[in-house]
């Protein structure tokens, strides 16, 4: 039985608590060889992913987004739902497609940094000094079996990603919020964003921001400034997610 179907069955049979702890892997359909299929398209979906909704507009932005200058940014990491696990194990292009389906787009690097630093240029979303356990950024690192992850979307990769997954549900840490109300910008899952300045390397149009639940590579703590530019947008890793942005309704502005 394919894992996506098993997760749906788990929820339907009353295993809601167990299902809630299952990491929400790729939101994008994946074409698989016919022999790997289980009657439905060979896809791995987040089992309870809600369909796109039409959100009421508040201050020029949908009510589940935060207005900043001329743009809106999702309050939470995708799927932008408080109390849900963030999407992970996605490429930058998965994020682009998911946001486009919802009439949004992947945030740019500059938009993400501005949302994190706030109007006063903070080093961290919540202030200028790092505070332990405010954000989900100090979990222990677990040795990764990359050969298993390379088998995505088959079960060995999903099993390995599940073993590694240590993200909190969105909004679980009440103080991990920016001055303007954007949640979980540092820690939890790393977030794909589109480069604001083009790269000279083909395929490197995206970077990862915010680090993840086990901190940063070569940096003591996840900060608004830190950028992981080491991977192309096609890179798929267990700790990478994203959030969406959109243009703010015309005629509505706030301090940049």
Predicted feature residues:
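Short, acidic, Ser/Thr-enriched surface-loop or helix-capping motifs
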Residues: 184
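Disulfide-stabilized, aromatic/cysteine-rich ligand-recognition loop
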Residues: 14-30, 34, 38-48, 55-56, ...
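Generic structural signal for well-ordered beta-strand positions
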Residues: 190-191
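Short aromatic-cysteine micro-motif
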Residues: 60-122, 129-131, 138-141, 147-180
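Sec-dependent bacterial lipoprotein signal peptides
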Residues: 1-11
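N-terminal carbohydrate-binding accessory modules
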Residues: 50-64
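Acidic glycine-/aspartate-rich tracts in secreted/extracellular proteins
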Residues: 77-79, 119-120, 194-198, 249-251
């Amino acid at each position: 039985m394919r894992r996506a179907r098993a997760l749906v069955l788990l929820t339907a049979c009353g295993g809601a608590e167990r299902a809630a702890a299952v990491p929400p892997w790729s939101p994008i359909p994946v074409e698989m060889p016919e022999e790997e299929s289980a009657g439905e398209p060979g896809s791995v979906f987040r089992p309870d992913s809600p369909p796109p909704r039409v959100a009421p507009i508040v201050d020029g932005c949908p009510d589940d987004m935060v207005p900043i200058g001329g743009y809106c940014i999702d309050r939470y990491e995708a799927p932008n739902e408080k109390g849900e696990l963030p999407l992970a194990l996605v490429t930058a292009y998965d994020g682009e497609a998911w946001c486009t389906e919802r009439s949004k787009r992947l945030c740019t690097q500059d938009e993400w940094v501005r949302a994190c630093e706030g109007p006063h240029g903070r080093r961290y979303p919540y202030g200028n000094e790092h505070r332990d356990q405010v954000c989900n950024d100090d979990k222990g690192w677990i040795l990764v079996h990359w050969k298993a992850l390379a088998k995505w979307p088959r079960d060995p990769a999903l099993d390995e990603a599940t073993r590694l997954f240590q993200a909190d549900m969105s909004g679980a840490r009440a103080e991990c919020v920016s001055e303007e109300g954007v949640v979980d910008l540092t820690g939890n899952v790393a977030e794909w964003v589109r480069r604001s300045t083009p790269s000279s390397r083909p395929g490197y149009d995206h970077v990862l921001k915010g680090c993840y639940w086990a901190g940063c590579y070569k940096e003591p703590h996840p900060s608004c400034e830190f950028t992981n530019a080491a991977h192309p947008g096609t890179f798929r890793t267990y700790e990478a997610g994203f959030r969406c942005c959109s243009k703010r309704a015309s005629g509505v502005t706030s301090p940049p």
